[in-house]
């Protein structure tokens, strides 16, 4: 059995920043993640996706953000337990005991749940033969955008992923059709402004008021996408790639059985320190819910800092935290994290 100060569930960007924050406060960390590598959705779903709202980075690829966060956390020697899930929780006095799907046992004073969307998968559009085209012409995630160079692409959706990828791929695609059932997009206003600016050229055509209706092609190769409006008028879009971005299915898995207050696949927390209804267990990032919550990586970073400062007295048996700015602290030499 391992003994540590903090167990962090989730090795996405918010979980990795929590490792750094814990280290700055002198807390030892173990990190559990179901994926084979650290990085969460940033690595498994969209490593090349540009992120625009990280301070000091006008634009940074998701993969590069994870690389920098891992470097930032490395001096504190976190131990990563990858390709396994946290499945059982037992409370013993002032400690928690966590068991993973690989029978790893970890004893900890504090738990930080930074599991993002939990177990995730794409929300697929209800098209009869879509499986015939998946992985060759239909993709739900992008990990190598170069494969779309010179293609005619239909992107479906109106949120950040749909809009950001339309902008990003417009540099290399032959033609992009962005299909959305409404006239208004829910992406960041600046992204929508960029989208509409590019749409003034022939690179992106906005198909609003329409939804996906059917796919046409042969041998898993898409030839066209049929879209339909509310009056059942159809339009045929010549395309060889479909990218549906309708969000992710969320599943908390075993976390839902831990006695936490859960609402609509999110964990309810207080809005001051992001503690759950169980003292010593915190939830941060996209998995956490409170009034006024913003689902931003930046917000998750702030939640990590607040929750771990609050957890300090629990880890160190009631000792008061003497606050210091990071410029007064010595994080030590760079070292390598350990993966179990």
From Swiss-Prot:
Named cofactor requirement(s): FAD
Gene3D superfamilies: FAD/NAD(P)-binding domain
TM region positions: none
A single MF term (Gene Ontology): NADP binding
Record text on cofactor binding: Binds 1 FAD per subunit.
Pfam families per the UniProt record, alphabetical: Pyr_redox_2
Family: Belongs to the ferredoxin--NADP reductase type 2 family.
Subunit structure comment from the entry: Homodimer.
Record's protein name: Ferredoxin--NADP reductase
Biological source species: Rickettsia conorii (strain ATCC VR-613 / Malish 7)
């Amino acid at each position: 059995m391992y003994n540590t100060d903090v167990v962090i569930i989730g090795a996405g960007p918010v979980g990795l920043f929590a490792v750094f924050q814990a280290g700055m406060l002198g807390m030892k960390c173990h990190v559990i993640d179901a994926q084979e590598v650290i990085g969460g959705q940033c690595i498994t779903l969209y490593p090349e996706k540009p992120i625009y709202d990280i301070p000091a980075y006008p634009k940074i690829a998701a993969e590069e953000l994870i690389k920098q966060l891992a470097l930032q956390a490395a001096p504190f020697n976190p131990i990563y337990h990858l390709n396994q899930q946290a499945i059982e929780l037992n409370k013993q006095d002032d400690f928690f005991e966590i068991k993973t799907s690989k029978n790893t046992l970890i004893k900890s004073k504090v738990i930080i749940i930074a599991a993002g969307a939990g177990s995730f998968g794409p929300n697929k559009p209800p098209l009869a033969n879509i499986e015939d085209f998946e992985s060759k012409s239909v993709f739900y995630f992008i990990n190598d955008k170069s494969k779309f160079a010179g293609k005619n692409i239909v992107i479906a959706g109106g949120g950040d992923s749909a809009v950001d990828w339309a902008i990003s791929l417009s540099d290399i695609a032959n033609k992009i059709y962005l299909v959305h059932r409404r006239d208004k997009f829910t992406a960041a206003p600046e992204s929508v402004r960029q989208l509409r600016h590019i749409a003034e050229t022939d690179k992106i055509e906005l198909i609003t008021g329409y939804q996906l209706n059917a796919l046409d092609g042969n041998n898993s190769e898409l030839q066209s996408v049929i879209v339909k409006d509310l009056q059942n008028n159809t339009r045929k879009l010549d395309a060889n790639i479909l990218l549906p971005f309708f969000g992710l299915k969320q599943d908390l898995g075993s976390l839902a059985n831990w006695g936490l207050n859960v609402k609509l696949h999110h964990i309810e927390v207080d809005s001051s320190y992001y503690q759950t209804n169980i003292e010593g267990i915190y939830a941060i990032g996209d998995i956490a819910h409170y009034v006024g919550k913003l689902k931003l990586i930046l917000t998750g970073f702030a939640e990590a800092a607040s929750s771990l400062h609050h957890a300090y007295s629990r880890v160190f048996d009631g000792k008061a935290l003497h606050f210091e700015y990071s410029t007064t602290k010595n994080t030590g030499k760079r070292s390598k994290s350990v993966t179990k």
